[in-house]
């Protein structure tokens, strides 16, 4: 297991178990995981052309959403005068992250702390830490959010994986909850009704599992 620089120009590092199992991530572009290869298969979709244009948001990989997911339905900051409105999905995905690598424990740790930049939008002192453990056939995340302020800190947190799926016929939900949150009306809805409108967004209310079966096994 080792950590090495994969693409110096783009600031991408690779965290590798072996040649068939690794992840790539970019600390300076929101700590985003750009690629996850498991047993030789690319699990994530990633738009490399868009990534090279730093004026555009990243499409693909696993962006980190903090301190909100989605948009706030307001034209001004919820924290009052003197603060900028929080951007869509928050600011974490646009900032440079710190990282460390624990070879003995076999995990990568990503850090984001409050700064002058974050306090333009969000008047709180915080530390966000994400431990990423790479295993054969799995990628595990442990998220710790530490409120260092003296008052309550409202947060949303999300991981936004883009899965590399070629055919929806091979998708299967396991233990899918009956109900979900309708994002447009902020009401409880039937999950299958909402999945038929999945392009509009759906929040499942309990844990679920999405399985994808490759139509052609790897040689």
Regions found by a protein language model. Name each.
Residues 1-63, 69-78, 87:
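Beta-strand-rich N-terminal accessory domains
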Residues 2-18, 114-115, 127, 200-214:
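Beta-strand-rich recognition/accessory modules
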Residues 2-7, 82-135:
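Extended, loop-rich substrate-binding clefts of extracytoplasmic carbohydrate-active enzymes
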Residues 13, 106-108, 139-141:
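Hydrophobic residues embedded in beta-strands of well-ordered beta-sheets
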């Amino acid at each position: 297991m080792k950590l090495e620089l994969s693409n110096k120009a783009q600031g991408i590092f690779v965290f590798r178990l072996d040649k068939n199992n690794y992840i790539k991530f970019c600390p300076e572009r929101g700590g985003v995981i750009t690629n996850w290869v498991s047993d030789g298969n690319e699990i994530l979709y990633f738009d490399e052309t868009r990534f090279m244009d730093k004026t555009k948001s990243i499409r693909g990989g696993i962006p980190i959403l903090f301190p909100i997911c989605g948009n706030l339905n307001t034209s001004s900051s919820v924290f009052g005068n003197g603060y900028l409105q929080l951007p869509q999905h928050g600011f974490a995905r646009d900032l440079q992250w710190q990282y460390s690598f624990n070879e003995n424990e076999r995990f990568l740790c990503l850090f984001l702390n409050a700064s002058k930049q974050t306090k333009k939008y969000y008047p709180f002192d915080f530390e966000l830490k994400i431990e990423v453990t790479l295993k054969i056939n799995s990628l595990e995340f442990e998220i710790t959010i530490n409120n260092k302020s003296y008052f309550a800190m409202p947060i949303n947190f999300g991981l936004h994986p883009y899965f590399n799926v070629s055919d929806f016929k091979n998708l299967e939900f396991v233990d899918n909850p009956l109900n979900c949150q309708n994002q447009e009306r902020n009401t409880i809805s039937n999950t299958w009704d909402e999945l038929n409108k999945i392009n509009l967004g759906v929040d499942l209310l309990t844990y679920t599992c999405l399985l994808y079966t490759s139509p052609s096994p790897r040689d």
